[in-house]
A protein has these predicted regions:
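A glycine-rich phosphate-binding loop feature that marks nucleotide/adenosyl-phosphate handling sites
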Residues: 95-102
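Aromatic-residue-lined binding/catalytic grooves and analogous aromatic/hydrophobic interfacial grooves
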Residues: 103-149
Length: 149
C-alpha cells in the first residue's frame, strides 16, 4: 500500500505515475478509500472492497481527515482519466466503485497534511513528501518504471 504523492495537484500527480502504477494504484487507492468506508460504518461500505491493511500508515492517513479522503479521491479520478488516455479503456475499479467512493464517509474535518512517506529511509525527505516520492521513483522504481502506453 502506498500513495504516490508526486505533486500536490492530483492531476499532475496522476500524470507522473508510471504505466505500471497507472494500473496498480487504481486498485490500491480504491482499497484505501474502501477501508475508510468500512471503518466508519458508512452506508456505502457493503459496496466497497473488503477491508485490507487497516493499520497501514496510508490507510490511517486516508481515514484521518475528510480532506485526505477528498484529495485521494481526486487523485484516483485523475488516475482513471490518465489510465483511459493511455489504454483507451476504463479501469475496472473505476467502473465498479466510482459511484460509491465519490461519497466522503463522514470523516473528521482535520485539514490536510501530506501523506506518510512509506518507502526506504534513504529516499525520505523530512517535511517534503513530493521530493521524497520523486526520489523514490528515480531510485527504487527506476528499474521497471516506464511511460510507453
Amino acid at each position: 500500500m502506498n500513495i504516490f504523492y508526486l505533486s500536490p495537484d492530483p492531476r499532475h500527480a496522476a500524470q507522473y505515475h508510471c504505466d505500471q502504477h497507472c494500473s496498480k494504484m487504481m486498485i490500491e487507492y480504491a482499497q484505501l478509500m474502501s477501508a475508510a468506508h468500512r471503518m466508519t460504518e458508512s452506508s456505502h461500505a457493503d459496496s466497497c472492497y473488503k477491508l485490507a491493511h487497516k493499520n497501514h500508515p496510508s490507510t490511517i492517513w486516508t481515514r484521518s481527515s475528510a480532506d485526505h479522503y477528498s484529495w485521494l479521491f481526486e487523485l484516483w479520478r485523475e488516475l482513471s482519466n490518465e489510465f483511459y488516455a493511455r489504454r483507451g479503456k476504463h479501469h475496472g475499479s473505476w467502473t465498479k466503485l466510482k459511484d460509491v467512493l465519490c461519497y466522503n464517509p463522514h470523516l473528521p474535518l482535520e485539514g490536510f497534511t501530506e501523506p506518510p512517506q512509506c518507502m526506504p529511509d534513504e529516499y525520505k525527505v523530512n517535511g517534503d513528501a513530493v521530493t521524497a516520492y520523486r526520489n523514490y521513483y528515480m531510485g527504487d522504481k527506476a528499474s521497471f518504471a516506464s511511460w510507453n502506453w
